[in-house]
Amino acid sequence: MERLVATRLVTGLAVKIMRSNGVIHNANITSVNMDRSSVNVEWKEGEANKGKEISFADVISVNPELLDAVLAPTNVKENMPPQRNVSSQNHKRKTISKIPAPKEVAAKNSLLSESGAQSVLRERSTRMTAIHETLPYENEMEAESTPLPIQQNSVQARSRSTKVSIAEEPRLQTRISEIVEESLPSGRNNQGRRKSNIVKEMEKMKNKREEQRAQNYERRMKRAQDYDTSVPNWEFGKMIKEFRATMDCHRISMADPAEEHRICVCVRKRPLNKQELSKKEIDIISVPSKNIVLVHEPKLKVDLTKYLENQAFRFDFSFDETATNEVVYRFTARPLVQSIFEGGKATCFAYGQTGSGKTHTMGGDFSGKSQNVSKGVYAFASRDVFLLLDQPRYKHLDLDVFVTFFEIYNGKVFDLLNKKTKLRVLEDAKQEVQVVGLLEKQVISADDVFKMIEIGSACRTSGQTFANTSSSRSHACLQIILRRGSKLHGKFSLVDLAGNERGVDTASADRITRMEGAEINRSLLALKECIRALGQNKSHTPFRESKLTQILRDSFIGENSRTCMIAMLSPGFNSCEYTLNTLRYADRVKELSPQNAETNDDNLQMEDSGGSHASIEGLQLQDDFLLKDEELSTHNSFQDALNRVGELEDKAVDELRELVQKEPEWTNLLQMTEQPDYDLENFVMQAEYLIQERSKVLIALGDSINSLRLALQVEEQASKQISKKKRSNK
């Protein structure tokens, strides 16, 4: 049966096929393979041509009309195969029909055969004539399908001719003869026409394929022109650009409402700087909405296939590279200014990697090495303080405004408004933290504050890092204090934190760098825990773990305490690790899940940033990384050694200060000898007393110095252990 159906399957025939997903659509037969009982079909999908191989059985199952056409009887006369000998055609015509033709027809046929009918045959029409009264279904099939093989036509013609009823012979005889007369001479031309149509169709399909290939090649060339292949990591840049094309971004603007939070965590992305542009780095950070940040982390599979891992983080507010300092201030620090007039304590932090824009955000715009201090958060807050001070609801309070500006470097406090004098942090009898010797300067306008900012910024400690030749290596804190007489009414602390990338330099060969990294890490961890304790209303706040949190203790304790953190992000490809560390740090401060964020972009593939959210009580280094137990033990040993060094250093400095403070007694003793009638016995007694006291101090100082040296050796060994662990893990 399949062989019979195969006779109807010819090249160019339009059939229906079923895809693997169950979809049925039309396709054209391009070739027939009788040995494998299959056909090759081709169809157009979109702008591409596709094809597949289908068995005869599958074709019959989807196209049952082919089988019906083979089995059904028909009285339609089809075109006869062309023959070279016209007399043989007449013979076949008579034997196939088995119906005696009238004399006129016979005479006509004989006349045609004798008079050289070849020329007449070429002039006849090649149209096909069908008897619609007899088999309308088969006529419809013939009209829809493509021309069939010549052998098939002859076989079907014979089968149909034998089934003509004898009773219908007088009526059909003349009609059949006419059909035979018209079909037989046109057989040669029909065959040529069928072949030419198939060839034309194949050529048309070939031309379409060539055009499609040319179009695809042009697209590839155009796509290659869009990306500079000389740029490092251009493949990642291409993937990021294609991903961003699917996003529906909604940037934050000044028209959006400013929500008030007790703890507000925001993220700001800066644009690529000149150094990154010169290196042709790609931008790996996207801000699709006002509270979502995406990091396109470049990854490599085992087979070195490049792909992106898109990590999503949610915060209260997210600012892209187009946001100005004024926009950032409106949603971060501005809501906190009014709280200090109501007797509250507010704190605003700028956190992030060196070169991410912390000082730019807090201090103001840079033009070369000069800074415009009137365009930073410091200046905006100062203006709003004096604006609120003149309002009637606060004017009757008769408040005075004071400013302090200090820095914390290596756990030590220095006054930036008093020639960088070293300060001591102590607790008084009321268990309130006092910065002994900190200079508070009264100001009467915002311009006075600007001058203080310029003076303090010029004295701030800086150092060189891989990101910046002159990087701030200390935490700078500007405090705007409101006093009503001598009583504290409110305080706003604006803190520009040190770069967090030095927190991983605890294994450096340079002791100063190790100390910097350890102190920065210590203060940042303690700061995070204090903010979390404030947000979760914990009974214990670990503010004693660092000098920074110790000084800002009153900002973490109390119902009127409010905090805002601005996490600064560097978008460059080479800053991906530090950027993720910054985002994880900010995420753990408030722990907002990105899955709960409201966004209109359904195509965002947001993944949980991961990591444990367990609270860290005490000091653990490298909070930005998940450490194994043995690694954590090594870091704890280093931290213990570092704490011991700090304690012994403070002890030795105090003893030395005590020794220097007794220096006037020795001066007085010396001046006694210059008098002509001084009491020698009294001189001896005072000298012996001072020597004994000095001996005690010197012995104690000597012991402290020896202990400090041993502690430094222990710290050195602990640092080497960390270095070995890192090398073994690589």
From Swiss-Prot:
| Compartments it resides in | Cytoplasm, Cytoskeleton; Nucleus; Chromosome, Centromere; Chromosome, Centromere, Kinetochore
Which Pfam families does the annotation name?
Answer: KIF2A-like_1st, Kinesin
One Gene Ontology biological process: metaphase chromosome alignment
Region Globular: what ranges? 1-256
**GO terms for cellular component:** cytoplasm; kinetochore; microtubule; microtubule plus-end; nucleus
**Any GO molecular function:** microtubule motor activity
- Positions of region (Negative regulator of microtubule-binding): 211-242
Q: What is its main location?
A: cytoplasm
The family note in this entry says:
Belongs to the TRAFAC class myosin-kinesin ATPase superfamily. Kinesin family. MCAK/KIF2 subfamily.
Q: What is this protein called?
A: Kinesin-like protein KIF2C
- The gene designation is kif2c
